[in-house]
Amino acid sequence: MAQRWSIGEDFIIAKFCQEQQYLDICDNLLDELINRLRQKGFSSRSKSAISKRARDFTDLFRGWGSEHTAKQVKQVYGLLSGEGYNNHLKELKAFITERQQAYMGGKLDFLNSPADQKIHMIHRAQGRKFVDVLEDYIKNSGIKPRSRMYCDVGMSEDTFSAIRRGKYKTVSRENLFKICFGLRLKYDDAVILMKSCGCALQDSNVLDCVVEYFLRKGPTVDCVYKDKGKEKICYIYDTFQIDADLIESGVPELFWGFRKGDDKDDEEDDQ
């Protein structure tokens, strides 16, 4: 019987590609991984034998890079879904660990790359207010903020102002998710930044646990649909496509947000 991939195992590969979504290096890393597996005697399955699940998996990365990158991810998935599954997975884990240690240890030259910027951003966060760091993130990431940042992250103006004044030393998972959504910032990176600024996560309530569940399941998947004539987009941290009916019936409002660039809507709100 074919080996079934669990969410956790999908996440290992997805996390690898998501961490390296800086596409100037992603292509080379995937090439290196494919070559390493082949040198160890792992042969890729034929194209026809690569499962539909592998094809679905690569679709997650089409928005991040070239068709070339998507094909490489499919090759990796094909290598890992054949005989000797556990050995393949072990090899992939070792590869990821080795490369991540090299990144964090500064052994690779990523001058002016997003990876380098992220590390410096975290270092600069020490002893600063969380909101100040987020504003730096906006400026350095090329994201076009809306007319008011607190709207961009989905918080009330009072809550945002209180955070800016340093009133809160804790941040709820719900608000942290809204920050991630508004700024397109990865959840784990937001946690690192928050802790670097001396903030902590609040004790979990039921909603926080639901949010945490989604946040920990995998990379973002965009679900776009029409609502009252406006195009909405849903960011769900999951490795599976979510049916639109399921979203509309059960996902909390905090998951919704309008597409970036809807400045006309903001202008109308301001009037």
Feature annotation, model-predicted:
Residues 92-107, 191-219:
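Short, charged recognition helix plus adjacent turn
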Residues 107-146, 223-231, 235-254:
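A short, Lys/Arg-rich alpha-helix, primarily the initiator
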Residues 167-182:
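Short, basic-rich loop-to-helix N-cap that marks the start of a DNA-contacting helix
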Residues 1-16, 118-130, 155-158:
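Short, Lys/Arg-enriched anionic-surface-contact patches
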Residues 46-50, 160, 190:
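Helix-turn-helix DNA-binding helix
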